[in-house]
UniProtKB/Swiss-Prot annotation:
It is a multi-pass membrane protein. Keywords: Acetylation, Lipid droplet, Membrane, Transmembrane, Transmembrane helix. Residues 34-105 are annotated as: Hydrophobic. GO terms for biological process: lipid storage; response to freezing; seed oilbody biogenesis. The modification N-acetylalanine is found at residue 2. May have a structural role to stabilize the lipid body during desiccation of the seed by preventing coalescence of the oil. Probably interacts with both lipid and phospholipid moieties of lipid bodies. May also provide recognition signals for specific lipase anchorage in lipolysis during seedling growth. Belongs to the oleosin family. This is Oleosin 16.4 kDa. The keyword Electron transport does not apply. The chain crosses the membrane at residues 31-51, 65-85, 86-106. Its main location: other. It comes from Gossypium hirsutum (Upland cotton). It is found in: Lipid droplet; Membrane.
């Protein structure tokens, strides 16, 4: 049995039939892709290394200053944080108060029925405006017509 050479079919041969797909190497597109991206990737990696180095050096130089000035910096940071939180919360409370007053005012208007009067007044105003625009349109049309007749006479 050991003297007999068995031929095993590969996965590609099973899937594609008995056709074998011989490739001698990477395609031209793959080679160009690698040649294009290798310098770009190397440059970006070098820039990342320089950035990391600069950050570590800056941190090493600034750490003693942070330790020395921490009795001043920490309370100052806390004070700034509390001031910003105070301004933001006062703004939120103001908006909440305005929306509450608006809600109460609208509920009061609905209860007294004054909103129907406001709606009727708005309808009359719109009707008056439509009538005014219609009248102005007629006047403008007559003016243009008169000018056209005058231009035709001369």
């Amino acid at each position: 049995m050991a003297d007999r050479d068995r031929s095993y079919r590969t996965f590609d041969q099973v899937v594609r039939g008995d056709r074998t797909n011989y490739q001698s190497g990477p395609s031209t597109t793959q080679v160009l892709t690698v040649l294009t991206l290798l310098p770009i990737g190397g440059t970006l990696l070098a820039l990342a290394g320089l950035t990391l180095t600069g950050t570590v050096i800056g941190l090493c130089m600034a750490t003693p200053l942070f330790v020395i000035f921490s009795p001043v910096l920490v309370p100052a940071a806390i004070a700034v944080f509390m001031a910003v939180a105070g301004f933001l919360s006062s703004g939120a409370f103001g908006l909440t108060g305005l929306s509450s007053l608006s809600y109460v005012f609208n509920r009061f208007r609905q209860a007294t029925g004054t909103e129907q009067l406001d709606a009727d007044r708005a309808k009359r105003g719109m009707q008056d405006m439509v009538g005014y625009v219609g009248q102005k349109t007629k006047e403008t049309g007559q003016t243009i017509e008169n000018k056209a007749h005058e231009g035709g006479r001369t």
